[in-house]
C-alpha cells in the first residue's frame, strides 16, 4: 500500500485535462482526420488497403466477404470499431465519390440517391487495379514501417505510390483546429502537369494551370470560381461554385428541362425532393412536375414547366433554392513531415516529386542489394562449373555440409555466400547447370546494377523513369474530363420577383380566413356562389398576380403575403395558404384585407378600432413587410379587447369616422382627431361606452356617402352625412334607430355602391343601394349584407 501511495502523482485537474486533450488533438490531427501529402490517404484508408493486400485480395483474386476484411483490419491495424472501417471501405468503392476507386465491392455499395450500402455480411470486396497500384513494391520496404497499436504487427506509415492520389480523389476531414477539403482532379491532367514540372522545374503556376485546368468532379457539372484560379491554387484555399448541367427538350408539347449532371457530394433524391417541395409550396408557378428518370446510363431528372419563363430563368431560381448549385470550399490542408500545412498546387507537385525521387532511390538500393547478392552467387556458380570435377570430389570427401563450405572457401577462395549456394545444390543440379544460362544471368544482373547505380546517383535518370511511369499510368488510368470549367462566376442578384407570372387573377378573402384565387373572368360567378351563413367576404376583386395583399386581424396583427406564392383554384384556409407556415392563431379573424400599392403607401394611413372603443392611426408603410411572411403587431390590445374594424385612409381623406356601439349609439367625429402613433401603441378613446357596451362597427364617411344600417328584421336605414351629429372624439354616441332594433350590418355607401346579400345556402346576390331599399323586409332579413364596392 505504501509503495502504491508513493507512485501517485499529484497534479492539478486543469493540467491533466490540458495535457490529455493536447495529446488527443495531436493524434486526431496526425493520425486520423487529415491525409498525408505523399499518398493522399488518411490512416484508416491506408490500413484498409494494406490489410486487404496482406489478405491477398488483389484485383485478380476472388472477392471475399467485407466482414472478413473488416475483422482483419480492425484486429490488426485499426481498433476503432467495425462501422467506421466498413463506412470507409464503402466510400472508397463509390464511383460517384471518387475519380478512381481504390476498392471494388461486389454487391450493394449504396447509391447516389443516398441509399445505404448492404451490411458487410452481404457484400464482398477486393482491391481495385488503382488501389493495388498504390501498394506497388510495398514488399521492398521502400517506406518506413511502424508498429501497430499493440506492437504485434507492423504497418506502413505511408504507401509507396507514384500516383498523385491526394489530388486524384481528393478528401475531406475535420481535426482539432484544422479542416481539409481537397477537390478531386483529372488524373491525366495531373500526370501531364507533373511531367511538365519535371521538364520545366522553374515554370510558374499559370503554365501548370494550362494543363491542370481545375477540379474534375466524378459527377461532372459546371465549375465556376469566385476569384482567379491562380490565386486559389497558389494559396490552396478558395471557393468553387458547382452547378448542375442541363439541357432543354420538348416532348408531347410539354416544355422540359433535363438535368444530366448534378454537383459533387449532393444526393440526387434530395434534389428531386427539394424541387417537389417547391412545386407543392407554389414557390415558382412555372414549375409543373418533376420526374426522376435516371438509370444505369446516367442522371436524368426531367422538370416539366410552363412557357412563360425561359429554362435559364427557371434554372436560375432552382440554383438559388436547391442543391443544383453548391459551393465547394477548397482547403488543401495535409500532413507533411508530421505537421499540418496548407499547400498550393506547385508546392504539392514539388513535395510529391521529392517523395517520388526518394521512393526510386530506395527501390534502386533494394534492387542493387539483391542484384549484388545474386551476382556474387552467379559468379561462384560459374567458377564452380568450370572446375566441376574438383568441386564434386571435394564435396564427396567432406564430412558434412559445414566441412564442405570451409574447404571450398579455403582451397578455392569462394566467398561464404558462394560456398553456401554450391553446397545447397544437389549434385545432379550442379553437374547439369548450363554455363551459358549463368553468363546470361550475370549480364542481366550487371545491367540491373548499372541501372540502379545510375538511378541512385543521377536525378536526371530518376526524372526519365518518372516521366515514363507517368505516361504508363496515363494510358492505364486516364479518363475524359467530366466537370466543365467555365471561369469566373458573375454574381447576379436573383430576386423572387424575377420569376413571377405577370397576369390578372380573381381574389376573394373572407372574415374567417377563407382564401380563394381563380381566373379573373370567374369573379362574378364566384361572388354569387360564395356560400356561408356565418362568414362574410371582406375582400374581392381582380388583382395582379405580382401584387402583395395585407390582412389585419382581430388580435391587432398585420400580415403581408405575395399573391404569386399562393395556390390557385381552390378555397383554402389561411393557415393552409402557405405550406408549413401557419399565419393565424386559433380564433383569430380577419377584419381587413387589401392590396399593397407601393406608389401610394407613403401617403396612406391604417385606421384601427377595437371593441372597447380604442382608435389609432398608423402609417401603412411602417407596418407592411414585403420581405417576409410574418405576423407583426399593428395595434396593442388590452386584455379581453379585440380589433373590430380597420380601413385604409389616404392622408386628408376621408374626413369623418363613425363608430357604432352594441346599444345603437352612433359617434361621428373628424378623422384628424385620431393620433398617428407607432404600431405597438394602444391608441386613444374614440367613443364613451357604458358598462358592457362594445363597439360593433366602424367606418369612414365621405361627404357624399350615406350611412346604411340594416337591422335584424330587414329594415334598411339610410342616413346622409349631414344628418349625423358630428361631435368630437370621446363623445357619447347619438341614437339614430329605435332601441328595439338591432343592427346586423352597417356600412357607408353611395348610389354607385354595390351591396352583397348572402342568402345562406342559396348563394349571394349583388344589389345597388336603391335596389336594396325596394326589397321586402322579409327578404332583407334573410341576408347578411355588406358593401362590395
UniProtKB/Swiss-Prot annotation:
One of its GO terms (cellular component) is cytoplasm. Residues 34-499 form the Topo IIA-type catalytic domain. Belongs to the type II topoisomerase GyrA/ParC subunit family. ParC type 2 subfamily. Heterotetramer composed of ParC and ParE. The gene is parC. This is DNA topoisomerase 4 subunit A. It catalyses: ATP-dependent breakage, passage and rejoining of double-stranded DNA. The record marks 121 as: Transition state stabilizer. It is found in: Cell membrane. GO terms for molecular function: ATP binding; DNA binding; DNA negative supercoiling activity. CDD domains: TOP4c. Disulfide bonds: none annotated. Topoisomerase IV is essential for chromosome segregation. It relaxes supercoiled DNA. Performs the decatenation events required during the replication of a circular DNA molecule. Its EC number is 5.6.2.2. One of its GO terms (biological process) is DNA topological change. Pfam families: DNA_gyraseA_C, DNA_topoisoIV. The active site is at residue 122. Keywords: Cell membrane, DNA-binding, Isomerase, Membrane, Topoisomerase.
